[in-house]
């Protein structure tokens, strides 16, 4: 064993060449050419898209809809989360807005556009804003529960506003003095003005319905003495008028008392005693020159004054009354707030009625004003009526007087004077200030412009009376 030689490890030449102890040397680096540009950054290829099966869209349920402009919907998903979705008008593509709502991670590619609230406050629609105010007023002024629960800003729900104003008047203004105005009509006009303020405050105004039934008329009846203008904007024609009234009627007794020189009791062609009143200063529309008394042409505006001087005095009275009430007024001095629609015409259908399409304007004389001395009165508002002792009164478009036969058209007991109409607006503003914080909303009353739609109607349109049957015969 001692003489045996030590054995050397046997390794094949191939293994010796590839062994890590004897790794082959790297090839020499090549020098880059000067004209070769090396990119600063190697572009990274996008990862291969993963194939994800399409997931079914979550079921959505509309909780409620807000009647704003544009409208909104509160939608609840199957997971219980809610978001607000805006309803775009027809023909307008929806805006591309991202949904920032925190949701559970989902692989669905469906994107829902929502309305983002930059102020991080709950969205309140115009309908909700108006309903909050109306609920407050209805609870405070004791509106019945049935009407309160069914209130939805519909045009035919005007009685809610009237009841609010009536309760407020009973609590705050008992014994309200009125001049040739019925209390019912005064409350009606207060309700209309209150409705206009509520709709303006909330932003739920209907463009097809004017709630006040009023207009601002640039009348031009005080620019020149003896010159009156009708609703066409043209000068009214002076002609003679002969009126016969029953002796027992209210108008006949008033004519005998106020105009003893022009009114007399005579017998008509049938042998009955009547009061005959002759008016030499009557004024009519230019379209009614050839018409008899109380007869109007198809193109007439329906405006007629039996005494032109008395009518101009009434226009001067309301002008002086407004100037005394608003001494800093700039634009409204020559304009008149007038009622266009009485209870007969205050309907959202817009169907013309038989007769006049506007309220009848009549000048009424203030009695016992001659006994007052202007130097003894310091109130400028009262001085306007002392200086011009006539007021303009708006009545039903086709009024029916006591002891007289009614006409074919509809009629009501609407009656309010021009000063009391302005007073109704003032009291509504006071009611608003007592119940709503902040500035008074701007109420826009349209300016009067003559339209052929307002012409006198001698023939009524065929009307439907309703029928529940499917077939007429």
Swiss-Prot record:
Q: Where are the residues of the annotated region Disordered? A: 1-69, 85-111
Which stretches of sequence are listed as region Flexible loop?
A: 243-277
Residues modified as Phosphotyrosine are 141
GO CC terms: host cell nucleus; viral capsid
Q: Give a yes or no for keyword Zinc in this entry.
A: yes
Q: Which UniProt keywords apply?
A: DNA replication, DNA-binding, Early protein, Host nucleus, Host-virus interaction, Metal-binding, Phosphoprotein, Viral DNA replication, Zinc
Residue positions binding Zn(2+) 2: 342, 344, 396, 412
Q: Where in the cell is it found?
A: Host nucleus
Q: Which family does it belong to?
A: Belongs to the adenoviridae E2A DNA-binding protein family.
Q: What is known of its domains?
A: The C-terminal arm bridges DBP molecules together, thereby creating a chain.
Quaternary form? Homomultimerizes on viral ssDNA bound to pTP. Forms a initiation complex with viral polymerase, pTP and hosts NFIA and POU2F1/OCT1. Interacts with host SRCAP.
Q: What is the protein name given in its UniProt record?
A: DNA-binding protein
Please tell me the species this chain comes from. Answer: Human adenovirus F serotype 40 (HAdV-40)
């Amino acid at each position: 064993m001692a003489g045996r030689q030590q054995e050397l490890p046997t390794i094949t030449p191939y293994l010796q060449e590839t062994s890590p102890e004897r790794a082959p040397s790297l090839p020499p680096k090549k020098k880059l050419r000067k004209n070769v540009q090396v990119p600063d950054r190697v572009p990274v290829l996008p990862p291969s898209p993963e194939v994800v099966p399409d997931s079914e869209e979550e079921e959505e349920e509309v909780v409620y809809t807000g009647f704003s402009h544009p409208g909104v919907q509160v939608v609840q998903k199957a997971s219980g989360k809610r978001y607000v979705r805006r309803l775009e008008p027809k023909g307008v593509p929806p805006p591309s807005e991202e949904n920032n709502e925190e949701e559970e991670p989902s692989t669905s590619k469906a994107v829902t556009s929502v309305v983002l609230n930059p102020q991080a406050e709950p969205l309140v629609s115009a309908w909700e804003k108006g309903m909050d105010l109306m609920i407050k007023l209805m609870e405070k002024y004791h509106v019945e529960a049935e009407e309160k629960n069914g209130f939805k800003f519909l045009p035919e729900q005007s009685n809610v506003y009237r009841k609010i104003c009536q309760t407020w008047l009973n609590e705050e203004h008992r014994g309200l003095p009125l001049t040739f105005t019925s209390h019912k009509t005064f409350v009606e006009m207060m309700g209309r003005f209150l409705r206009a303020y509520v709709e303006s405050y909330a932003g739920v105004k209907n463009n097809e319905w004017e709630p006040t039934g009023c207009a601002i008329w640039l009348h031009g009846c005080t620019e020149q003495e003896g010159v009156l203008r009708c609703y066409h904007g043209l000068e009214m024609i002076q002609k003679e008028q002969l009126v016969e009234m029953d002796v027992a009627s209210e108008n006949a007794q008033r004519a005998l008392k106020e105009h003893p020189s022009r009114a007399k009791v005579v017998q008509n062609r049938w042998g009955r005693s009547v009061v005959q009143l002759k008016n030499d200063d009557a004024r009519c529309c230019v379209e009614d020159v050839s018409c008899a008394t109380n007869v109007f042409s198809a193109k007439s505006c329906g405006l007629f004054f039996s005494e032109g001087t008395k009518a101009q005095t009434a226009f001067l009275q309301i002008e002086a009354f407004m100037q005394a009430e608003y001494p800093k007024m700039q634009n409204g001095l020559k304009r008149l707030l007038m009622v266009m629609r009485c209870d007969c015409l205050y309907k959202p259908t817009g169907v013309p009625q038989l007769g006049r399409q506007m309220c009848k304007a009549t000048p009424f004389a203030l009695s016992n004003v001659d006994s007052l001395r202007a130097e003894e009165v310091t109130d400028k508002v009262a001085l306007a009526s002392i200086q011009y002792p006539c007021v303009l009164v708006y009545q039903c478009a086709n009024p029916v007087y006591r002891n007289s036969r009614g006409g074919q058209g509809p009629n009501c007991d609407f009656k309010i004077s021009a000063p009391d109409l302005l007073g109704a607006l003032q009291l509504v503003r006071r009611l608003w200030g007592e119940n709503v914080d902040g500035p008074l909303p701007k109420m826009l009353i349209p300016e009067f412009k003559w339209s052929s739609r307002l012409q006198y109607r001698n023939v009524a349109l065929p009307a439907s009376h309703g029928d529940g049957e499917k077939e007429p015969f």
